[in-house]
Amino acid sequence: MYNVEKKQYEKIDIKYKFLLGVQNKNNNSEKEYLNLLKTIIKENNIKISRNSKVYSKFGVRMEFNLLDGFPLLTTKKMPWKTILRELIWFINGETDNKILNNKKVHIWDLNSTKEFLESRNLSYEIEGDLGPIYGFQWRHCGAEYIDCDTDYKNKGVDQLKYVINEIKTNPSSRRIIMSSWNPIDIPKM
């Protein structure tokens, strides 16, 4: 597991409870997800987003107990290494898609092209710059976003560090909250 404070990986014992491409009948998180999909399709609530038609349901909440294993879908093949690389990229507070590309991760490619950035009137038109997305909000919430090449060390609120500290020192706190969304930054994303 990645240790944020030491900025290195540490070996921990993780029990994986999934099979790629095979449905696991004891996977409660997957059952919850699939039931949600059935409900959304049955209700047929279609919205038009900026990219396509989307089936949606407002205000849905799903809860996963990580002691039961990582809630990875087993009804379809999931790129496990890609998921981990993207997560580590978020944990590091990165916003430069070229870092992911160097690791053969292409999830964000369409959102970082020059054409996309220009279509959104984004001023930091460095190709590959994704703006103040999830990882930036986790590690530098409230900092003024300039571009993906700027050093944001000790700028903004490090929500991830705060949440980890609270879990360790005050686990019953109702203030253990981390948000990936800062309303002020949404137009820059």
Q: Which residue stretches match the model-derived regions?
A:
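Terminal, non-catalytic protein-protein interaction segments that mediate quaternary/complex assembly
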Residues: 2-189
